[in-house]
Amino acid sequence: MPAMPQPSRTVLMVSRGLDPVGTGRQIELAAAAFRDAGWRVHVAATTAGGAVPERLAAAGFAMHRVATRPVVDAAAAVRLVRFARSLRLEGPDAILTWGRSQARLAAALRPLLPRARLACQLGSPPRDRLTGWCLRRADLVVAGSPAVARGCGDLHVADTRVVTIPPTADPAAAAGVTRAELAVRLGLDPDTLWTLCVAPLEAEARLERLLWAIDQLGVVHRRLEHVLVGAGPQRQRLMRRARMQQVGERLHVFPHLDCLPDLLRQVAIVWQSGEVACGGAILDGQAVGIPAVAVDSAAARQCIVDGETGRIVPADPESEFPRRVFGILEDDALAARYATAAQHRTAAAFPAGGMAALVAAVAG
């Protein structure tokens, strides 16, 4: 049997420590696509936690933890720079960052590795001038949707440097964890209905809307429990507000969950209260037939066809968010119709070929 050719190019992917849904799943798929295309793949995680780094390491990828805290800090940036320089990346090689916080880190790498191609993938529209400044120093910006591309243009990123490539709907396989086992592990009642939201605990996720909706749903539906998966600087504020609104017994918050692929297939609904790439768990949930409800955002409009695969609700009045969730939970036929349509739509709108397009774009 002939020996496999040695990889001729190296890609360093830079991301937060994530779980295998949303952007985390996209990173797993991208790593596999680069390896299949003959690239040597290194992945650097700039925050602690998350199951994706361990999953990538188990799959044979060179995985590097450059952080010990749940947020990107100066120490992680310094370690990332040192590690990136140790790879001696040259002209054929590439750096691919995932998300806006990582795009800002990339600005520190640009002057130190000027010969490597720098690409930044964004799943949510950039908002601030600092991010725009960093993106303008990249060779390529991979926008996950037309709305993201427009946001880049608003920050004066040249159109010639922006390519729009939608995410790929290819959920991580379940590991065979049963509902009863999940209930024991997560402290849930197996006989209740479960909902799932995956979001960073940051202001843009607008999690106060989620808490208000949980509070309102508790009045009309007593057999509901809610799982929120996310880490970030808003955690203490969120938990304090949950206690004030007396929803703590129904809300289960975890910074990370390695069992998300199994949990995703057991929930009654996935929902999202703010602007989160891939809708958090919405894209993956729709691909396995879970109805979705989200407050209007660029990601929601990309993932959900309102009235066909789930519901998109306005931010005001606030009552619309829990009302639409309740309507699906109480109508099995409606939920089944949304589930079937969601699976068909994600297969057509977010095909597996997207990762090949990503590799080609990064390669130049």
Regions found by a protein language model. Name each.
Residues 139-162, 169-173:
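A short, active-site helix/loop in glycosyltransferases that binds the activated sugar's phosphate group
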Residues 45, 291-295:
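Short hydrophobic beta-strand element within catalytic cores of glycosyltransferases
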Residues 306-307, 311-318, 327-332:
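Conserved acidic donor-binding segment of nucleotide-sugar-dependent glycosyltransferases
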Residues 265-277, 290:
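Acidic donor-binding loop of glycosyltransferase active sites
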Residues 239-255:
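Nucleotide-activated donor-binding/catalytic signature segment of Leloir-type glycosyltransferases, i.e.
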Residues 21-32, 193, 197-219, 233-236:
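A conserved mid-protein helix/loop that constitutes part of the nucleotide-sugar donor-binding site
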Residues 111-146:
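A conserved, positively charged/aromatic
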Residues 76, 97-103, 122:
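Short His-centered aromatic/hydrophobic patch
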